[in-house]
C-alpha cells in the first residue's frame, strides 16, 4: 500500500468518524468492513471526490458574488488574456464607458493564439442605453446601442494591403481614391453622418452590448481586494450570422481596470494600450494536452436557451474513457437545481489542430447515460412522454436517477444514444499556476458538432483541475448515481462521498459534452 493511502487510512477515517457518518454511509457498509481493499478504495475515492466536490460547492473559490441590477458599467474594462472567437479570431478588448452613456471600445486582433503579434485594431465609438432586466437570460440586463464611428488601423504593411483589398472586394467603390491602405493610418469602416459602412469586410458586429451583467466579488474574502467583472453578450459561432444574432449567453468577462485581480498581468498591459500601441502579451509555450484527471467549473456557467450549469469531467487516460456529470440549475448563481446528467464513453487520441492554433482535436463517443430530475417541473416533463422514449414511462421521481441507455437516450431532453462529437481542447495555466482546460464552444444554432466540419474554432469557459489523477472507472461505477445537490428526498447521504461527476445538457435540445 502506498504511503499516501496509509496516511489516509490512519488519519482520514478518524476525522470522518468524528464528523459523523450515517447509516447510509458506504464506509459503514458491512461489505466495506469485511474487505480492506474495498475500504481503502473508498477512502481514496472520498479524499479526491471531496476536493472536486468542495470546489463545485464553493464556486469562485468560495467568494460571495454580488450582481448589480441595474449594472453600473461606467469605467474602463479590459480582457484578462488572449481570447479566441470563432473563425478563429485571436483578440483582446479594452472598453471605456462614460457617464454620458457614450463609449469608446478597442478590439485588438492578432495573428497567433498568444496575442503576441498585433495585426489590426478596431476603434468603435457610440452610445449605449440600458433597458430592463432580461426576460430571457436571468441575471442579465438588456441594452440598446448606437454606433457613431468604426475605424480600423493596421499594424503591418502586409495586413494593410490585404485588408484594403478585402474591403474593396466586399464593398466595391467604398474606397473613393482606390489607393492601397498603409500601416498606422486609421480608415473609416462606419461613419454615422455620411452613412458609409463596410464593417462586414471584417465580420464586425457590436451586438455583444445588447446583453450585460456586472458581478462583484472580494478575492479570498479580502475586503481590500474588490474585483468587478463585466459580462457582455456572446458572439455567434458563424461569422456570417453575427449581425443577425441577439446574444443568449456571455463571452469571457472583462475586468474593471480599477478593480481587477492584481495577479492579472494582461489586464495591466491592455489597460495601457491604444490603437497606436496595441497590447503585446507575454509569450507562452502551448501546453501539451493530456486528458487525465478531474476538472470542474470555476463559476456558474451560462448557455444559450436559458441554461445555467456546472460541469465535472473525469478522464481515464489508461483506457481513453471519460465520465462526467452536468448539473443544471434554474438560476444564474447555480443554487436551485433542476436536473443532472451522468454520461460516459470513450475518446480518441488527440491530434494537433491545423485550423485553430494551439488547439488539439479529439473525437468523443457517448454510449451510456443516466438522468436525475431535481425538481417537480422536470420530473413532470419527463413523465409526459409516452412509451419507452426516456426511461420507464411515468416513473420519474424527484431525486431518483434512471438509466436511459436502454431507451437510446431521452427524447424529452433531445438526447440520442450512441452519440459522436468532434471536439477541440486547449490547456493553459492561470496566474496561480493552476491548470485550466478549455473545450469547444457549442454552435450558436443549437446543433451538435457531430461532423468534422462542425468542430468548434473557439472555446467555452475553462474548467480547473481538481485532481491530477482519477480512480478507475470500474471503481466509480457503484457511485455513479451520487449527486452534488445533497440529500435526495427520503435518503440519508454523506456530503463528502457525493460524486461530483458532471456533464451538461440543454433542456430542449441537449447536446452531448456541451
Swiss-Prot record:
N-Glycosylated. Residues 513-514 are cytoplasmic. Pfam families: APCDDC. Abundantly expressed in heart, pancreas, prostate and ovary. Moderately expressed in lung, liver, kidney, spleen, thymus, colon and peripheral lymphocytes. Abundantly expressed in both the epidermal and dermal compartments of the hair follicle. Present in scalp skin Highly expressed in the hair follicle dermal papilla, the matrix, and the hair shaft (at protein level). Residues 1-26 form the signal peptide. It is a single-pass type I membrane protein. Keywords: Cell membrane, Disease variant, Glycoprotein, Hypotrichosis, Membrane, Signal, Transmembrane, Transmembrane helix, Wnt signaling pathway. InterPro entries: APCDD1, APCDD1_dom. Residues 27-492 are extracellular. It comes from the Eukaryota. SMART domains: APCDDC. The chain crosses the membrane at residues 493-512. Changing residue 9 to R: In HYPT1; dominant-negative mutant that perturbs the translational processing from the endoplasmic reticulum to the plasma membrane. Negative regulator of the Wnt signaling pathway. Inhibits Wnt signaling in a cell-autonomous manner and functions upstream of beta-catenin. May act via its interaction with Wnt and LRP proteins. May play a role in colorectal tumorigenesis. This is Protein APCDD1.
Amino acid at each position: 500500500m502506498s504511503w499516501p493511502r496509509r496516511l489516509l487510512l490512519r488519519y482520514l477515517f478518524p476525522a470522518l468518524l468524528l464528523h459523523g457518518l450515517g447509516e447510509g454511509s458506504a464506509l459503514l457498509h458491512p461489505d466495506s468492513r469485511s474487505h480492506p481493499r474495498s475500504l481503502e478504495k473508498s477512502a481514496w475515492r472520498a479524499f479526491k471526490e471531496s476536493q472536486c466536490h468542495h470546489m463545485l460547492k464553493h464556486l469562485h473559490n468560495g467568494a460571495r458574488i454580488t450582481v448589480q441590477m441595474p449594472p453600473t458599467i461606467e469605467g474602463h474594462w479590459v480582457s484578462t488574456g488572449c481570447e479566441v472567437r470563432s473563425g478563429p479570431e485571436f483578440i483582446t478588448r479594452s472598453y471605456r464607458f462614460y457617464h454620458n452613456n457614450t463609449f469608446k471600445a478597442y478590439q485588438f486582433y492578432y495573428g497567433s493564439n498568444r496575442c503576441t503579434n498585433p495585426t489590426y485594431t478596431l476603434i468603435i465609438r457610440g452610445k449605449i442605453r440600458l433597458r430592463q432586466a432580461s426576460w430571457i437570460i436571468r441575471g442579465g440586463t438588456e441594452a440598446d446601442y448606437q454606433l457613431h464611428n468604426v475605424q480600423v488601423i493596421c499594424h503591418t504593411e502586409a495586413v494593410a494591403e490585404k485588408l484594403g483589398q478585402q474591403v474593396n472586394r466586399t464593398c466595391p467603390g467604398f474606397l473613393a481614391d482606390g489607393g492601397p491602405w498603409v500601416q498606422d493610418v486609421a480608415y473609416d469602416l462606419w461613419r454615422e453622418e455620411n452613412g458609409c459602412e463596410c464593417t462586414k469586410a471584417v465580420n464586425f458586429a457590436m451586438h455583444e452590448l445588447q446583453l450585460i451583467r456586472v458581478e462583484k466579488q472580494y478575492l479570498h474574502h479580502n475586503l481590500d481586494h474588490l474585483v468587478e467583472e463585466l459580462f457582455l453578450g456572446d458572439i455567434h459561432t458563424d461569422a456570417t450570422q453575427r449581425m443577425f444574432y441577439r446574444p443568449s449567453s456571455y463571452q469571457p468577462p472583462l475586468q474593471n481596470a480599477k478593480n481587477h485581480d492584481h495577479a492579472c498581468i494582461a489586464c495591466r498591459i491592455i489597460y495601457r494600450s491604444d490603437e497606436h500601441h496595441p497590447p503585446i502579451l507575454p509569450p507562452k509555450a502551448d501546453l501539451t494536452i493530456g486528458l487525465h484527471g478531474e476538472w470542474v467549473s470555476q463559476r456558474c456557467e451560462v448557455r444559450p436557451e436559458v441554461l445555467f450549469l456546472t460541469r465535472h469531467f473525469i478522464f481515464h487516460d489508461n483506457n481513453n474513457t471519460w465520465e462526467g456529470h452536468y448539473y443544471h440549475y434554474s438560476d444564474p448563481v447555480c443554487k436551485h437545481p433542476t436536473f443532472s446528467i451522468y454520461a460516459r464513453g470513450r475518446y480518441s487520441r488527440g491530434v494537433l489542430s491545423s485550423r485553430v492554433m494551439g488547439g488539439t482535436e479529439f473525437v468523443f463517443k457517448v454510449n451510456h447515460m443516466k438522468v436525475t430530475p431535481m425538481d417537480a417541473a422536470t420530473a413532470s416533463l419527463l413523465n409526459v412522454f409516452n412509451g419507452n422514449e426516456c426511461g420507464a414511462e411515468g416513473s420519474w421521481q424527484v431525486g431518483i436517477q434512471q438509466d436511459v441507455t436502454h431507451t437510446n437516450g431521452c427524447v424529452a431532453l433531445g438526447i440520442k444514444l450512441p452519440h459522436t462529437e468532434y471536439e477541440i481542447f486547449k490547456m493553459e495555466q492561470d496566474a496561480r499556476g493552476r491548470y485550466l482546460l478549455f473545450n469547444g464552444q457549442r454552435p450558436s444554432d443549437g446543433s451538435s458538432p457531430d461532423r468534422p466540419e462542425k468542430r468548434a474554432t473557439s472555446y467555452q469557459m475553462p474548467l480547473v483541475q481538481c485532481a491530477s489523477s482519477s480512480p478507475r472507472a470500474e471503481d466509480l461505477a457503484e457511485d455513479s448515481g451520487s449527486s452534488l445537490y445533497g440529500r435526495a428526498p427520503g435518503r440519508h447521504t454523506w456530503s463528502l462521498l457525493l460524486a461530483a461527476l458532471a456533464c451538461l445538457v440543454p433542456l430542449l435540445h441537449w447536446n452531448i459534452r456541451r
